[in-house]
């Protein structure tokens, strides 16, 4: 809205780089990708490399660190996150060749509200019937390990990237994040993830307050439950479940007014993307 009305995010960043990105004005693009994923089938088992793996094995590749907030899950919905304790690379390769790769992966029942960080090198997959909010580095470098023998639109097996994935993998399990909870005058703040390239918090807002961003970097607010009016810079927006707003770096405080108890996820970059 305001001077940015009608612009795509890419165009807005190009035209108002300093206002939106603040001290990150040198970034080539907006430093976060935030989206909902609603899995209507089991998604492919994949892994993303870290910066070190890209530098060593994949010149031109880009690291990807991502986190998931489980929004909804059907009965039996699950997440595959990391390898089972005690597993080795050799075990994994044998299982992969036999089409039994899931036996080597940690399967976790998906519970709304739980949060998982998929650090670079973590093998992961989203199961059917699970809805997540995904916050990540904007990167297309993905290596697919297993895709349940599915075919592409031409009837061919979908491409796998086993060799690249094995060079990127970390053979370790992943657990749900334990939030650091702080009671406030307006409700409750949960510090969820502090990764090298982003931070995530969850705000349970019971009454209106002025949110001081306390950083010269942009932030993304996503309403998970309830409704919220945000005011700042002479503008006002009403947000419902699933709706989001980017708070530019130049806007140092925002007035938040909930309609009943409202839950909001916030994320912001912490380093230049690609350094994690």
Give, region by region, the residue ranges found by the protein language model.
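An exposed, glycine/acidic-rich loop-and-rim segment of catalytic or binding clefts
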Residues: 104, 115-117, 122-177
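Transition-metal
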Residues: 1-87, 147-175, 200, 273-276
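Ligand-binding loop in jelly-roll beta-barrel domains
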Residues: 38-42, 50, 73-76, 122-142, ...
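Active-site glycine-rich loop that binds ribose-phosphate moieties when present
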Residues: 87-117
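Acidic/His-leaning functional-site neighborhoods
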Residues: 178-243, 251-252
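A generic structural signal for well-ordered coil/turn residues at beta-strand boundaries
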Residues: 30, 41, 63-66, 75, ...
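Short acidic-glycine-tyrosine-enriched beta hairpin
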Residues: 105-117, 131, 232-251
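Short histidine-centered beta-strand/loop micro-motifs
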Residues: 24-25, 56-59, 191-192, 210-215, ...
